[in-house]
């Protein structure tokens, strides 16, 4: 991962880093637009808190897909700007 991507990914997580459960596996990939975590068969993408700093503007901050669907262009199972909704979704 390039230093730029590492710095950007760090900024994406800055405000919620302490809230990310320890059992989530960081599977971030430099070619993705934002960092991602794997938990319970779900891939959780976490974009920048500030929308105009996101590579893809006009989208919600958090996206969840089934891990098996990665790279297939499927519609997310959940799109939200609220981290509490992400936690609830992946734990059900």
Features from the language model and the residues they span:
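Intrinsically disordered, low-complexity regulatory segments enriched in Ser/Thr/Pro
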Residues: 42-85
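Negatively charged, low-complexity tracts enriched in Asp/Glu with abundant Ser/Thr
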Residues: 1-42
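Short intrinsically disordered terminal tails
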Residues: 1-3, 88-92
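Structural alpha-beta junctions
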Residues: 19-22, 71, 91-92
């Amino acid at each position: 991962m390039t230093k730029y991507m590492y710095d950007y990914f760090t900024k994406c997580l800055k405000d919620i880093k302490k809230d990310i459960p320890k059992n989530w596996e960081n599977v971030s990939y430099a070619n993705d637009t934002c960092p991602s975590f794997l938990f319970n068969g779900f891939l959780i993408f976490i974009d920048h808190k500030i929308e105009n700093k996101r590579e893809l503007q006009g989208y919600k901050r958090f996206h969840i897909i089934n891990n098996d669907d990665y790279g297939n262009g499927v519609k997310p199972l959940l799109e939200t700007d609220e981290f509490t909704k992400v936690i609830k979704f992946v734990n059900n």
